[in-house]
Amino acid sequence: MRIAFAGTPEFARVALRQLLDAGFDVPLVLTQPDRPAGRGLKLQASAVKALAVERGLAVTQPRSLRLDGKYPDDASAAREALEAAQLDAMVVAAYGLILPAWVLKLPARGCLNIHASLLPRWRGAAPIHRAIEAGDTETGITIMQMDEGLDTGDMLLSERESIRSDDSTATLHDRLSALGGRLIVEALEAAACGGLVRRPQPAEGVTYAHKIDKAEAAIDWSRPAEEIERRVRAFDPFPGASFQQAGETVKLWRAAVAPQRGAPGTVLSAAEGVLRVACGDLSLDLLQLQRPGGRRVGARDFLAVRSTLQVGATL
């Protein structure tokens, strides 16, 4: 079976690796253009491109696939490459570009998407973040036959994954990426022998995982402690929950709910390795923090540097 692969970040790289290790023929890889990254803002290839180059695969990086869009030459070149590949199917995983109708119709078996939720819950761009933020206790992977809607296509395979009480987006991402890679291999192997059954998504239970905005990172101490703690885990590693202290933006990577109460944003404890801040109902112990340009440290090390942070201060 000849498969094109469209994906960009680490989540997609894991799936591509599993497809290649399973012996699938991948004549073409689509991924986002190289982007400036790091302190030097040097152009950096995506995780998918790095693997594709390592494995000697052909790569194309269109800025758009819309033939009538801003970059028609990119789209036309991609179309030529896809048509020449004589595809049986196309696998899409966190690609980052909208696929127009001509792409969806081109492969003989259409386009299959690896989506990191149990559809129809958490359609959209940030299903892992939003599941943790909402306090969901389980999520999963859905392999979907793509159509022109936003994650509305028929479901082909799905499998559940528990969300642990200490999961961050980073830890849950790693388990789901491995699960997604395994399920897409199973789906394609079943498709090759006619064993896949398409199931329409239920009309009930639809929710949308809107893209994460950096502005969401700012902690609102007036919110309930449990809600803030979930957001801390949901925004690890991006964009990182944060608060202002002494004119600096401090990122908070781990926290735990504590029973003490006080005015929201007030420091209730700042000694003996305990940094506790009042929230809208209870309070939070800030367990792992990061100053600008620094590394993640525990509360004790953070307080050793922040000697001016005293009980009664307001964040």
UniProtKB/Swiss-Prot annotation:
Family: Belongs to the Fmt family.
Family annotation (InterPro entries): Fmt (IPR005794), Formyl_trans_C (IPR005793), Formyl_trans_C_sf (IPR037022), Formyl_transf_N (IPR002376), Formyl_transf_N_sf (IPR036477), Formyl_transferase-like_C_sf (IPR011034), GART_AS (IPR001555), Met-tRNA-FMT_C (IPR044135)
Reaction(s) the record says it catalyses: L-methionyl-tRNA(fMet) + (6R)-10-formyltetrahydrofolate = N-formyl-L-methionyl-tRNA(fMet) + (6S)-5,6,7,8-tetrahydrofolate + H(+)
Keywords: Protein biosynthesis, Transferase
Taxonomy, superkingdom: Bacteria
GO MF term (any one): methionyl-tRNA formyltransferase activity
Gene: fmt
A Pfam family assignment: Formyl_trans_C
Protein name: Methionyl-tRNA formyltransferase
Any single GO CC term annotated in Swiss-Prot or TrEMBL for this entry: cytosol
Lineage: Bacteria, Pseudomonadati, Pseudomonadota, Betaproteobacteria, Burkholderiales
Positions bound to (6S)-5,6,7,8-tetrahydrofolate: 117-120
Record's function text: Attaches a formyl group to the free amino group of methionyl-tRNA(fMet). The formyl group appears to play a dual role in the initiator identity of N-formylmethionyl-tRNA by promoting its recognition by IF2 and preventing the misappropriation of this tRNA by the elongation apparatus.
EC number: 2.1.2.9
